[in-house]
């Protein structure tokens, strides 16, 4: 209890100062020097459902809480034994990026990426169907979107469709097997899956379950 109070007090002090200190103290970065994963930060570029760079992404950097980073390295070790590696699509996500998603979703005439990312869903229904929300676990720093390189998961990342549900019966047996393999290796190392997105995992014992950060990725 005393340790938790100390951490919360320290965090509140940091929040009143520089976001740089928060990153250094509580977050780590994954890169080619310390990770075997392919870092493919989709929201830094235009290969995403908005079709453009998202607010808050000024660099293609993967930030995760120190605890999530440690757990993910165990996943990498397990996959390396099978000559496999992760592909990472998104990590920590600033709250301003989530706000950007919300504003985009309200612009019903902007549908240039519909055929790729949400062909079966009307844009006006993205909130109702739960594909867009005002808050995201990614902003807490211990959620990651990923896949396994070379394995077919049945849908692209961020595909707004029931086929993206982890246990969807609409994918092939081989694709479901790949999803379950990813699920097992992630769960074995402390993560839990969001059932509506095969790529979405959160550290079970995340250090900041109620805190939504907003420092820019740079």
List PLM regions with ranges:
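Sec-dependent N-terminal signal peptides
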Residues: 4-14
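Conserved metal-phosphate-binding beta-hairpin within the catalytic cores
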Residues: 201
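Extracytoplasmic cell-surface/polysaccharide-interacting catalytic and binding patches
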Residues: 17-91, 95-196, 205-218
């Amino acid at each position: 209890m005393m340790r938790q109070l100390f951490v919360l007090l320290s965090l509140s002090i940091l929040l009143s100062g520089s976001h740089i200190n928060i990153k250094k103290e509580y977050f780590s970065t994954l890169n080619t020097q310390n990770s075997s994963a392919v870092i493919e930060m989709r929201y830094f570029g235009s290969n995403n459902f908005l079709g453009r760079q998202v607010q808050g992404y000024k660099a293609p950097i993967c930030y995760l809480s120190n605890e999530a980073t440690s757990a993910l390295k165990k996943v990498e070790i397990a996959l390396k034994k099978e000559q496999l590696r992760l592909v990472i699509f998104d990590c920590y996500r600033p709250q301003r990026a989530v706000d950007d998603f919300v504003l985009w979703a309200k612009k019903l005439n902007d549908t240039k990426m519909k055929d790729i990312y949400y062909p079966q869903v009307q844009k006006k229904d993205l909130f109702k169907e739960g594909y867009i929300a005002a808050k995201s676990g990614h902003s807490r720093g211990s959620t990651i979107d990923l896949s396994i390189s070379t394995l077919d998961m049945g849908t692209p990342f961020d595909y707004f469709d029931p086929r993206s549900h982890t246990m969807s019966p609409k994918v092939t047996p081989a694709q479901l097997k790949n999803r379950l393999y990813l699920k097992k290796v992630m769960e074995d190392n402390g993560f839990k899956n969001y059932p509506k997105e095969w790529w979405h995992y959160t550290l079970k014992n995340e250090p900041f379950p109620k805190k939504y950060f907003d420092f820019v990725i740079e």
